[in-house]
């Protein structure tokens, strides 16, 4: 996808509405793969900042979304630093 808006819209269509409401920022990470896209996600869930990796199958996006364990952070600055270093 060529721009952040398209990327964000695609991502939001693939994840649940409840999870999507907590998302603050996303970026594509990981090796280039023709079938899977790996995202780094930063968000805020009930006042608690988190980061998490999300893998989406590009061909069956709505039926296959895998989340790794969320890593919770003390504040948004720590979460953003962690997010920026995710690969």
UniProtKB/Swiss-Prot annotation:
| Protein name listed in UniProt | Uncharacterized 10.2 kDa protein in e-segB intergenic region
User: Gene of origin?
Assistant: y07A
Q: State the superkingdom.
A: Viruses
**The species this protein was found in:** Enterobacteria phage T4
